[in-house]
Amino acid sequence: MNERTLIQPDVEFINYLKKNGGDTVKECYQCATCSVVCSLSPEHEAFPRKEMIAASWGQKETLISDPDVWLCHGCTDCSTYCPRGAKPADVLGAIRSYVIESFAFPKFLGSAIKKPKYLIPLLIVPFIIIFLLLYNNLDGNFSQLNEGTVKFSRFLPHIIVEAFFIGGNILVFAFTAIGLSQFWKNLNNITPAANKKSFLGVFFATISEILTHKNFNTCSTNSSRFWGHLLIFYGFFGAMLTAGLAVGALFLYDMNPIPFFHPIKILGNLSGIALVVGCVVVAVHRFKTKDEKGSNTYNDWILILFVFLVAATGLLTETLRLFDTPFLAYNTYFVHMVFIFFLLWYAPYSKLAHMFYRTLAMVYLKMNGRDKKAAIFLNMLFITFFIR
């Protein structure tokens, strides 16, 4: 007699998916159209059909240990062609959000960052810290900032800013490492490769794919998202590189402020512009396609908003310094600092954490040979081309 398996759906998990963009999960009837049209679906154990089945049955443990969830880059080809409107891309996005929250350390921050009611309390933390540093530096005499030319080192010495920036980031990376180590240990739910590759053997190939955004540029219905994400990606890391170079220029060459046409300043300005433009492209795309292609969750918008605010206030701060308007320049700089610390200190808990989790998952998949594209997709493209 065949052995029976009792499946017990996790209703709370299903409700989480529905509240976080995956409200169409129950519309799926496993036709596998999503697996056929997905350009990233491997040859065997096709994705994302099996993930949609597991999600509709509330199989939480199966999904949080499934690296295939991270194959999806949100291009929404699957949602576009789904005959039932199940929007697999949104369901997978909700699953990834749950994974990040599950492995977050401390866990309560992973939950808080996704709820609008906690936005103000989370903002107040960096606000109070920076305000106290500023108050201590100025001995409570803020009126002195209205005198003389704009000089941010007088407002808040760079050594203090960098000490908290570096110290905070070390703590953030430590918390991130705890979550990622648990995530890595938990990855399974795929058939291991007979000749499993080494971690280092595939790590640099994975980084190369990320730098070129190769997997973002494979879908046929969502090209504008590729350019928006690419601008944000390089703008973000360009800004981080600028910050590091600026610290070196300050402490090694006492360069303060950095001249407007200096390469470091040019890199920073171009990065800021790339971030602003990228966020606008992504936001416009989301507004245009929200009904037919995908949902827009608070978790999505909070990241787009704060990346935009960090870049916009940074560029505005520089402009106000050049125009030598102390009151506006110092206040904008203060707000800019609050936004920066909010974005970076809460990175392991927001959607920004996907860059860490996706990278590890892609490495794991490559180690086990799960990065190969399905030949059926290439055949479908060929047929579709001639049908049209």
Give the residues covered by each predicted segment.
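Active-site-adjacent structural elements in folded domains
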Residues: 18-23, 65, 218-219, 325-327
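Cysteine-centered iron-sulfur cluster-binding motifs in ferredoxin-type domains/subunits
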Residues: 22-42, 66-86, 95, 379, ...
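Non-heme iron-sulfur electron-transfer modules
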Residues: 1-12, 41-68, 85-110
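N-terminal extramembrane/targeting module of integral membrane proteins
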Residues: 1-29
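Short, well-ordered alpha-helical packing segments
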Residues: 52, 69, 76-79, 92, ...
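Secondary-structure capping and boundary motifs in well-ordered enzyme cores
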Residues: 27-30, 64, 71-74, 269-272, ...
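Membrane-embedded alpha-helical bundles of multi-pass integral membrane proteins
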Residues: 103-386
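Short, charged cytosolic
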Residues: 81-100, 197-211
